[in-house]
Amino acid sequence: MSYQFSKYETHYRNLTYLGVPIIIGQLGNLILNFADTLMIGHHSTEELAAAAFVNNMFTLVIIFAIGFTYAITALVGILYGQDKTHRIGEVMKSAAAANTCMAILLSAIMIVLYLNIHRLGQPEELLPLIRPYFLIQLVSLPFVCWFNTFRQFTDGITDTKVAMWILVAGNVMNIFGNWILIYGHLGLPEMGLVGAGLSTMISRIVMAFIMVGIFFFSKKYKEYKKGWSLGQVKYADFKQITVLGIPLALQMGMETAAFSLSSLMVGWFGTESLAAHQVMLTISQLGYMIYYGLAAAVAVRISNFMGQRDYLAVRRTATAGIHLVFLLAILTSVPIFICRHIIGGLFTDNVNVISMVSMTIIPFMIYQFGDGLQCNYANAMRGTANVRPLIWIAFVSFFIVSLPLGYLFGVVMNYQLVGVWFAFPFGLTLSGVLYYIYYQKGLKKIESGAKI
C-alpha cells in the first residue's frame, strides 16, 4: 500500500497545488450563485423562478463557450511542456480571435431565443420578469468569453492562482452589488431581479478587463506578450483551436443541456417545482465545480507531460486524479445528505419548495461518483488532445439516455421534479465509463505513434 502511495505521491501533491486555486475560483462562482439564489429567493419566489429559467438558458451557452476555450489549455499546456514561450503568445492571438467569433455567434443565437421566449411554455406571470433579466445577461456574455480565453492561458502555464484571485474579488463585488441593487441600499432604488442582473454584468466586465490587462501589462508575462506582438492570427492555429474547441464545447454543452433543458420540463409542473429545481441546481454545482476544478488540473498536468512525451506520467496523473476526485465526492456528498431536510429553508420559506428539495437530494447523491468519473476522464482526454469521441459519448449519454429518461420518469410516470432528477445518474455514469474507455484507447494509440 505504501508503495502504491509513493508511486502517486508527487502527482497528488502537484494536482493539489494546481487544483486548489481552480477549485477556490469555482467555489467562488458557487458562492455567487448561492448568494444570487438566496437573495432573489427571499425577495420573491416568482423572481427566483424567473432567474432559474434565464440562468439555465445562459448556463448552457456559457458552458459551451468555456468548453471552447478549453482547447487553449491543451495547446498552451503542450507548448509549455516544451518551453516554447513565444509560440504560446502567437497561439493566444489566434485563440482570442477564435473566441471573439464564438462570442458573436452565441450572442446571435441568444437574441433569436429572446425573440421567441414566449413560445417556450413558461408561466405567463414570469415573462415580465424574464425579459429584462435575459437582456442584461446577454450584454455580459462576450466578457465571459474573453475572461475565460485568458484564464485558460494562465491555467495552461500552471499559474492557476491568477484567475482564482480575480474570480474571488469579482464575486465579492457581485455579492455586494446584489445587496445594493436587489434591496435598494446606499440610496439606490430597489431593483429586485434586474438589480441582480446588473450586478452580475458589472462584475463580469470588470473581471474580463483585469484578466486581459494582466496578460498585457504584467512583467512575468512579457515573453508571452512578445510572442503575441510579433505573431499573426494564423489560419492553421485558428483551425486547430476550432477543431479541438468544438468537441469540447459540444461535450460540455450537451451535459449542461441535460440540466438546462430539464428546466423546460420542470416548468410544466409549476412555479414551485421550478424554484426547487433552481435550488437543486445551485446545490449540485458544489460537487461539479469541485470535481471539475481538480479535473482541470489533471488536464493541465497531462498536457504538460504530453509535450514532454512522458506517457507514464500521463497515466499516473489521470489515476491520481480519480483517487482525489472520489475522495472529494465523499467529503462533499455526506454533509449534504445529512442536512437534506434543512437545506431548502436556506433559500426560501415556501414549505412545498423545501419538501421537494429534500426529496430531490436523493438522486443527486446517487450520481456523484459518476459525475466525478466523467469530469476526470473527460479532462484526461482533453489533456491528450483526444477530443473527437467526446461528442458522440456526450450525445448518447445525455440526449439518448438522460433527457428521454427524465421525460419518462418526470412526465409519463408523473414523478415530476424528482423523476426528472432520477434520470441524471444514468447519463453521468454512462459518460464517465465511456470517457475512461476511450481515454485508455486514445493513449495507447498515441504511445504506439498512431494518429487519433
Q: Could you say what each language-model-derived stretch is?
A:
Residues Y17-D36, I136, G170, S203-M207, ...:
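Transmembrane helical elements of multi-pass membrane transporters/channels
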Residues L48-I111, V144-A163, S263, A276-R340, ...:
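Small-residue-rich hydrophobic transmembrane alpha-helices
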Residues T45-N56, I130, F134, G197, ...:
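Small-residue hotspots at the loop-to-helix junctions and early N-terminal turns
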Residues Q26-L30, I63, A103, S107, ...:
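Residue-level hotspots within the lipid-embedded alpha helices of multi-pass solute transporters
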